[in-house]
Amino acid sequence: MNKSKGGLQLTVQTLSLVAGFMVWSIIAPLMPMISQDIKITSSQISIVLAIPVILGSVLRIPFGYLTNIIGAKWVFFSSFIILLFPIFLLSQAQSVNMLMLAGFFLGVGGAVFSVGVTSIPKYFPKDKVGLANGIYGMGNLGTAVSSFLAPPIAGAIGWQSTVRLYLIVMAVFAIVMFFLGDAKEPKVKIPLVAQTKDLLKDLRTYYLSFWYFITFGSFVAFGIFLPKYLVDHYELTTVDAGIRAGIFIAIATFLRPLGGIIGDKIDAVKALKVDFLFMIIGAIILGIANDMILFTVGCLTVSVCAGIGNGLVFKLVPQYFQKEAGVANGIVSMMGGLGGFFPPLVITYVTSITGTSHLAFIFLALFGVLALVTMWHLSKKNRSLAYK
């Protein structure tokens, strides 16, 4: 394997993922300002914030498959060109419908995740795949970049002009990928239908998808709802709330490679059991939190577990599904993205019914318990699957 080429592609694709996630998550940190200019209800805000997750999740399957057919270079390049249009539309938005339409197509920025996790393992030996995928996953930091930088920039030049700056980011990364992307990346041409049939027959596909639904779903959901939630429930300023949300995202992102390293060294399923146990504890803390300190402790606990858990799950995907890695990555990452779609809606609904959001966090704990049951079942049903 060409180590220098692998290092270059890991760097370029990780930075490209940063750019994609910056765009994918741009609406959430700017929503407090957007809602001042566009008349929008609380329920509509939840929908607008969740909409980018839909396309960003569903497209991960074809993006993973296309990566094996034409290579990461052209999937990334095409995605960045496409994203120019919804970014411009968002900068011109004057109604809720325009926000929804722009947000839907911004989902392309989230879909590029499955490109790298399909491409990167081709450049590294098996005992380094977990670490390599973990480093690539740090591209999730793009969400934190938007959370940290977008609110103060918008405070200075307005949210519309801030969004237009992202046009420059996309153009730059399209050029970078055009010149530095690997046109000679190894291709895997197995019919999509055949790959999908095999995966749908494998219990591990469903279990990995469920685990990632929780770990990555938590990462996405907290990144989406925290800025507005902290402003509404704890009366923080928009900038302060954005910084705190960014810290949550940054911790989860930087710990993702640690999950990959742990998965390279010990059995990843065993490590996931411990990880989910602590996530359950964090969710329970959030469910009973009545002050900012306790809420912060709960958020930080979930952040740590989400980051490590993300790395552990994507250590297992190429380990279990070598020939079907592209589609498997797409399916699992799609479910992770969808895991971020429902929580903001659930929190809004539960709060409207009960007057508090506490019960919504208890749902996260219950999902964690179900995940532990599936891990136990996987090991009991056939230990060779868990230690393959």
From Swiss-Prot:
One of its GO terms (cellular component) is plasma membrane. Gene3D superfamilies: MFS general substrate transporter like domains. The chain crosses the membrane at residues 14-34, 45-65, 69-89, 98-118, 139-159, 161-181, 206-226, 242-262, 276-296, 297-317, 330-350, 359-379. Its main location: membrane. CDD domains: MFS_NRT2_like. The keyword RNA-binding does not apply. Probably required for nitrate uptake under anoxic conditions. Also possibly involved in excretion of nitrite produced by the dissimilatory reduction of nitrate. GO terms for molecular function: nitrate transmembrane transporter activity. GO terms for biological process: nitrate assimilation. The lineage of its organism: Bacteria, Bacillati, Bacillota, Bacilli, Bacillales. PANTHER family: HIGH-AFFINITY NITRATE TRANSPORTER 2.3. It is found in: Cell membrane. Belongs to the major facilitator superfamily. Nitrate/nitrite porter (TC 2.A.1.8) family. It comes from the Bacteria. Pfam families: MFS_1. This is Probable nitrate transporter NarT. PROSITE patterns: MFS (PS50850). Induction: Positively regulated by the two-component system NreB/NreC. Keywords: Cell membrane, Membrane, Nitrate assimilation, Transmembrane, Transmembrane helix, Transport. It is a multi-pass membrane protein.
